A protein has these predicted regions:
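C-terminal cap of metal-dependent C-N hydrolases
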Residues: 298, 355-390
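Divalent metal-coordination and catalytic microenvironments
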Residues: 16, 35, 46, 66, ...
Length: 390
């Protein structure tokens, strides 16, 4: 199965490349995949390291975890510690990436330095980062300069829509649940206002923007209207915002403290409808692992994020395919073709001539999630990822 849908065929692979696709091929070593899917490995462009700490050990761990979940290519967020906003940190992060045995790891650059000045975007792009990242806390004059670089180098701008003046001390969605818990909330407008602003910048400069981890249906609506107007914008939504609501924060459950915050139940259902109607372009696990010392504390003090990377494909399959929300072919577009396109790659098809970056997925097995930092801890998932050597 690839972005074009499911079909029952044999695939011949020689020297890591697909050389033939047909019924009843013979000769050579045979892998019996009866009852399983042959899939392109997934791509996830919104991954953070343990405690957002950038070092070789954490990169290796995340690379190996990704493969367990069927994810063969990840892009690390740039707002790590240290942030990828200068040549020294970039070279430090790149050292050893070619020697990883797990998923391929790429890097994005942080367009803003800690002092809110512009990083050297041109140099960092030339040295191998796949995309510039920008939070909309950037003032308009800085955002416009970033857009000019994006226009010049013809890359996709990864944009997180948020407003510092509205976030303030907020730790979850502003709504009934936050009021009941007595926690400061973050209004949807924090995201929506800046999606609208960045759409206008994309229109003016004719640049590509991928809005990262969108949580509001209104933002999705604005982005899709912009697409109809010919503006090259797209949106990514996390699996958690499609399946879980802010009710998960009840009893001060710090695993449900995410950035962006989980939406209301009504908005979660609207996001599901947007997915069914092909209004969402990319999916992410929004994987952000934290040490227990940073999670097993008061909700206000807890780190943001949860874990899902090692369960990625079984999670997508169980919650989206078996439930009938989308098809397997559509999942391949959302988790392979479109994310790959955002970093300048062409992936998502199984056809003659392509590199055999594939996995096998057996949908008939089941397992229970055993991870206290997962929102799905204790839930049963369908499917097992099987690595194949090509």
């Amino acid at each position: 199965c690839d972005e074009d849908g499911e079909r029952k065929l044999d695939v011949r692979i020689e020297d890591g490349v697909v050389t033939e696709i047909a019924l009843d091929l013979s000769g050579g070593e045979v892998i019996d995949a009866q009852g399983a899917y042959l899939l392109p490995s997934l791509v996830d462009t919104n991954i953070r390291l343990q405690d957002s700490t950038l070092n070789a050990k954490n990169i290796k761990i995340i690379s190996d975890e990704a493969m367990l979940g069927g994810v063969g290519h990840i892009v690390l967020n740039a707002d790590s510690n240290p942030a990828i906003d200068n040549e020294i940190v970039l070279e430090f992060a790149q050292n050893g990436l070619d020697n990883l045995s797990g998923a391929k790891v790429d890097l994005m650059l942080n367009s803003l330095k800690e002092d809110a000045t512009l990083s050297n975007i041109a140099i960092l792009l030339k040295k191998g980062v796949v995309a510039p990242y920008m939070s909309t806390i950037a003032k308009n004059n800085i955002a416009i300069k970033i857009a000019e670089y994006v226009q010049m180098y013809k890359v996709t701008l990864f944009c997180k829509a948020e407003d510092n003046s509205l976030i303030k001390s907020g730790v979850m969605l502003d709504g009934n649940v936050s009021s009941k818990l007595g926690l400061a909330g973050i209004p949807n407008l924090s995201e929506v206002l800046h999606v609208s602003r960045m759409i206008e910048i994309a229109r003016h400069f004719k640049i590509k923007i991928l809005f990262k981890a969108i949580a509001s249906p209104r933002s999705v609506s604005l982005i899709n209207q912009a697409k109809k107007d010919g503006i090259d914008v797209s949106c990514e939504v996390s699996i958690h915002h499609l399946l879980k609501s802010d009710k998960e924060c009840n009893e001060f459950n710090t695993t449900a403290k995410l950035d962006p915050p989980l939406a209301s139940n009504e908005d979660m259902l609207e996001l599901q409808n947007a997915l069914k109607n092909s209004q969402i372009d990319c999916l992410t696990t929004l994987h952000q692992p934290s040490s227990p010392v940073n999670k097993e504390v008061a909700f206000y003090d807890a780190a943001y994020g949860c874990e899902a990377l090692s369960d990625a494909l079984p999670l997508y399959y169980t919650k989206l395919i078996r439930s009938g929300i989308i098809s397997m072919g559509e999942l391949m577009k959302l988790t392979v073709s479109n994310p790959a396109k955002s970093i300048g790659l062409k992936k998502g098809k199984i056809e003659v001539g392509v590199k055999a970056d594939f996995i096998l997925f057996n949908p008939k097995t089941t397992k229970f999630v055993q991870n206290t930092q997962s929102l799905y801890n204790g839930e049963e998932l369908n499917g097992e990822v099987i690595q194949i050597k090509t």
